[in-house]
Design a protein with these regions (language model features):
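Metal-ion/cofactor- or nucleotide/acyl-coenzyme-handling active-site neighborhoods
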Residues: 1-224
Length: 224
């Protein structure tokens, strides 16, 4: 999957963390210099934005919606007041992020790029059976490790192991992934009927109503 096969090639950055710079400090970015467009949230890390520009990525901006509209105390309201765009006199497009770049990309595909068929690739929203409990319980080091009885009902509720019938596999969710996956599934379910969502990740917990699953190879053949 490269800009050579897909000329309208976009990448998305929504996270303000400094670690996002690594995605633009990669040989593949240099290989396709000038062929990649970037859609960035207004809260993206400035060093990441700078590196993307240096790598020849053409940048487009959007305003990320991260909480409910509660008037002047809403972060949406505060960040909107801080944002100025000389080329967008009426403001930037505002998009629900779902708290993660995968859900953001799905929304951008639908609402901004006007795609009728959206494929999910690499969006597990869960952990593999082979991942360590330390990785799962800390969300890969992002949260503090807390000792829990793994046989307790509370633990099973916080870290459920679920079966994906579409790909005949199991995955384990943590509280963060439960929030992410529930939000994305609700957005997909409530989207217009002409919007088709295909999960080509070949694993994970994204399955259910209005989600068609198939292998990536099959998707590329059927929707070439």
């Amino acid at each position: 999957i490269t800009p050579d096969r897909f000329p309208e090639f976009y990448v998305v950055t929504v996270d303000p963390r400094s670690e996002t710079i690594k995605f633009y400090n990669d040989n593949i970015i240099n290989k396709y210099k000038g062929k990649i467009k970037g859609i960035f949230s207004t809260v993206s890390n400035p060093n990441t934005v700078k590196k993307a520009r240096e790598s020849g990525v053409e940048i487009f901006w959007f305003h990320s919606l991260v909480d409910y509209n509660e008037g002047e105390k809403s972060f949406n309201q505060i960040s909107a007041l801080m944002t100025r765009a000389k080329n967008h006199e009426n403001g930037l497009p505002a998009i629900q992020t779902g708290g993660n770049v995968g859900t953001t990309s799905w929304f951008l595909g639908w609402k901004i790029l006007n795609c009728k068929t959206i494929a999910l690739i690499g969006i597990n929203h869960g952990w593999e059976d082979t991942d360590s409990w330390e990785t799962i319980m800390t969300h890969n080091g992002m949260c503090k490790m807390v000792e829990m009885d793994k046989n307790s009902e509370s633990f099973k509720k916080l870290f459920p192991r679920i079966y994906n019938p579409d790909f005949d596999c199991y995955c384990i969710l943590d509280p963060i992934f439960q929030y992410y996956s529930a939000g994305l599934k609700e957005f997909i379910f409530r989207s217009p009927q002409d919007i088709k969502t295909i999960n080509a990740t070949e694993g994970g917990c994204i399955f259910g109503d209005r989600i068609n699953s198939m292998k990536l190879e099959e998707f590329l053949i059927r929707f070439d």
